[in-house]
Amino acid sequence: RQPNIVLILADDLGYADVGAYKADRYQTPNIDKLAKQGVRFTAAYAAAPVCAPSRAGLLTGRYPQRFGFEFNQGPGNREFKEGYGLDAKELTIGNVLQTAGYKTGLVGKWHMGIADQFYPTNRGFDEFVGLLTAETSYGDPAQPGVRVWPKDRAAAAAATKDGVFHRWPHAKILDGPSRTPVTDGKEYLTDYLTNRSVEFIERNAKSDNPYFLYAAYTAPHSPHMVVQKYYDRFPEIKDELQRINAAMIASLDDGVGR
């Protein structure tokens, strides 16, 4: 039997945010354990400095400049249109592993096209739950104990009917090819993505076939938002943004430890 594979990707996690790289403010014991037991690539570079092409490089193994995917999608970008995404001729690691008999799943952030031809279940993933674009709310800021920085972002998120921070369309968490919205903002997003990842692993561990999970967390990417149970771990950090960022990283690390 081929080995199972879990690829975990953080979003906007800095080199100095992880204990294994001598971070002195943040706590990442689970990520540190992986680093200690495995290999640290201290001279590795991302394929691009921004989200979408960097992810394209990771999943295809090719420089994104070679297939014309060099920019993020966003409302201020000329590339924000349904025809822009990861070229359909490019194979992803999901495509390759599907061919090798793997059950493939993506939980989390895609950010490589919103049209059907770019949808994850058409790009090598048997299952998908997550968001298609760059960011969304981590929860409903109207709920007690939710911390947001800056506070005006809380007002923008609370103004929506479902507690989702809509900087652009397609920001909801979707499930499967039907694009069914699946969250109501009451469960912290990082915890939700962890739970769905664990569910995928546990379900497929019972199969005779190997599985590949791409767990693409949104944390600690903006919006800077966290729930009280993580915020309370860092009373010594007085700067509000730094404290929320530390708490978001702690929630990510807890998920890795699951």
Model regions and ranges:
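Formylglycine-dependent sulfatase
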Residues: 1-258
